[in-house]
Amino acid sequence: MNSEIKSLPLLPLRGILVFPYMVIHLDVGREKSIQAIEEAMVQDRMIFLATQREAQTDEPTVDDIYNIGTVAEVKQLLKLPGGTIRVLVEGIARAKIEKYEHQDPYFRVEVQQYSEEFEKGAEVEALMRSLVYQFEQYVKLSKRIPPETVVSVVNLEEPGRLADIIASHLALKIEDKQNVLESVEIVDRLEKLCGIVAKELEIVELERKINIRVRKQMEKTQKEYYLREQMKAIQKELGEKDERVAECEEFREKISKAKFPKEAEEKALKEVERLEKMPPMAAEAAVVRNYLDWMLSLPWSKSTKDRIDINAAEEVLEADHYGLKDPKERITEYLAIRKLAKKMKGPILCLVGPPGVGKTSLGRSVARALDRKFVRISLGGVRDEAEIRGHRRTYVGAMPGRVIQGMRTAGSKNPVFLLDEIDKMASDFRGDPSSALLEVLDPEQNSTFSDHYIETPFDLSNVMFITTANNMYSIPRPLLDRMEVIQISGYTEEEKLQIAKRHLMPKQIKDHGLTEEMIQISENTILKVIREYTRESGVRNLERKIASICRKTAKKIVAGQAEKVKVTTQNLEQFLGIPRYRYGVAEQNDEVGTVTGMAWTEVGGDTLVIEVTTYKGTGRMTLTGKLGDVMKESAQAGYSFIRSRAQELGIDQEMFEKWDLHIHIPEGAIPKDGPSAGITMATAMASVLTGRKVRHDIAMTGEITLRGRVLPVGGIKEKVMAAHRAGIKLIILPNDNKKDLEDIPVNIKKQLEFKLVDHIDQVLAIALLEKEVVDTTTVLEPEAAVMDNPHFSAVDSQEVQQQGGTQLPS
């Protein structure tokens, strides 16, 4: 391929590319471009056309212009008003810019012009035929190019000219056209163009299919419209009503019968008017119909009549649940007030207690006792505010919130509405559902609760809301303030036994297809299951164990191994395996540095053993067992107090300087925190530093201060019941927790002895077994040591005998 060097003025093109053999009009308005054309006209009318990389650039530089362009001849020049000119140019040949001679007052470049020489072999012929065929198909489908163009293209013998003319007729991007222009080799250019035309064919075919589909849809819509208009005319002649008018009249009739509040009725009628003006097939019409259906399905004025019979309600509650005195009493109080005050708003109760104690099922029993509808929604894991208030109708697939959905499910405006697991809600970027619940659970506001979907106030003041939670400290304070909290503690052993006999056994026997004649389980056997196979505040695991016994019984009967099965304490292991827990004392022997404490979690109470040991070192204290900051600080406070009382306790000062102290609380994988183990850790430290053993049948709880005072703690009932389960006989509690002993069942108090203390000295006097404390100068009797203590008084040392508890010697 031969080439020659030429010096020509340069005309930068914006948004257009000129191929060789292409004739086109160009409107020129930039000063540099006009001067370049005028220079070409003065010389031999030859000019170099190159396209800009970015059409938006008004003052292009060397880097803004493609290097390869087209040498063209200016055929005509016409000056237009406004200082612009229009030129007719014809492309001659490809050329490449070798260098820019100057850029002012116009671009002038030295270009290398390519002349095309080729040998028309079989490959070139095949590519030409393929390209011509594809171009013919493209022209037929696109209908953008005159058919005459195909005739002129078919007769071309020069492959380069064929490619350039076809490329000039295609609607390609500037980048793709430039790619073809830069293909100097004939075969390369033909191959590229074949690929481009094939791709364009696919696009044109897709466009054709889309156009056909759209046209058919339009024809269908027009046909439907025409037929509907005809149907309207026919109905009018026959005196029949339009379907849309009939639908709207039906909605109006239903609204008038529904006894809506005034505001809701106005809103519904307004939506009916909107529906009447819409085309029946409009998407918005479906949204309005759905909205009206929701409005009509809500119980605006429907309510059930309460069964205000306290005795009957008590019978229902007692039949369904054993124990749970406080919530049952609150329900009967509500009934009594309802009988006297007819317009009383529904109470908002929050049942707080460990899992498995019957909080959720109690809500269902309350509804049965009041003869009301019952609705339950679980709030566990809810983190979207729209779950409570609903979505606005502007969203696709919008629905009311779960409160309004629950009211529709209930079908009455005064159901018992249970909000389960209210402490398990979360919040994120979508909002805070607990804040949305503030309006629902506020008696002063919920009479005008507004859902985003309904957009009109709905009265919730007659609803009896009951919420449940395992841990009330996880509930946001403003929300907790709106509810009446009722604490439900774990069941006692006797309560579990009665629940198993009255409820769990009959239920599981029936569920497993057995009869009472087929299986017998004694009370002692159930007690053994409670004591040695479960350790929980509720009865869920107990029910699972009873279910396991029933399954194995059913298997034996079906297999023909027995007609009747009797489960006793001797053969219980055949049904449940080896006991999982040891029932009896928490520790079997009196030991130095080992003390039983009491803990309270959201799943109930438990006992924990605190171990302390010493070894030679530098006086450091180590704490292990995954303890929280509060618990570590409590241990430090106890250690500081013991160190300050070393002389009175008979502890050598070297123990604090040359011996290290290690405090460990077993089950190290479980996080522990809180101040209630303060006196327990202090007692264990005093024991190991004095060498005095601690009673194994004793448990204690209480916070300690640097002065040795014992402060009150929470969860006393749960802690005491856990200690009772572990076989503890004597419990040490802060004196300020005396009021909490009233919550402990009488039968539990009869089996325990309680010591109420105000100071750690009293704790040590009770817990440490040796009778004398050796001072560095004098030996004091225990009583004398206690009386010499300025923190101790006769009132402080009082011992509370609870329901037959025996007094231990001090």
From Swiss-Prot:
SUPFAM superfamilies: P-loop containing nucleoside triphosphate hydrolases, PUA domain-like, Ribosomal protein S5 domain 2-like
The keyword Oxidoreductase appears for this protein: no
Single GO BP term: protein quality control for misfolded or incompletely synthesized proteins
Record-level Gene Ontology MF annotations: ATP binding; ATP hydrolysis activity; ATP-dependent peptidase activity; sequence-specific DNA binding; serine-type endopeptidase activity
PANTHER family given in the database record: ATP DEPENDENT LON PROTEASE FAMILY MEMBER
Pfam families: AAA, Lon_C, Lon_lid, LON_substr_bdg
Species per Swiss-Prot/TrEMBL record: Desulforamulus reducens (strain ATCC BAA-1160 / DSM 100696 / MI-1)
Signals that turn on the gene: By heat shock.
Catalytic activity from the UniProt record: Hydrolysis of proteins in presence of ATP
Protein's recorded name: Lon protease
Family note: Belongs to the peptidase S16 family.
GO CC term (a single one): cytoplasm
UniProt keyword list: ATP-binding, Cytoplasm, Hydrolase, Nucleotide-binding, Protease, Serine protease, Stress response
Location of the protein in the cell: Cytoplasm
Enzyme class, first EC level, given as a word: hydrolase
Database matches in CDD domains: RecA-like_Lon
Ligand binding (ATP): 353-360
Active site: 676, 719
Occurrences of domain Lon proteolytic (ranges): 589-770
Function, in words: ATP-dependent serine protease that mediates the selective degradation of mutant and abnormal proteins as well as certain short-lived regulatory proteins. Required for cellular homeostasis and for survival from DNA damage and developmental changes induced by stress. Degrades polypeptides processively to yield small peptide fragments that are 5 to 10 amino acids long. Binds to DNA in a double-stranded, site-specific manner.
Principal subcellular localisation of the protein: cytoplasm
Complex and partners: Homohexamer. Organized in a ring with a central cavity.
UniProt domain Lon N-terminal: residue ranges: 8-201
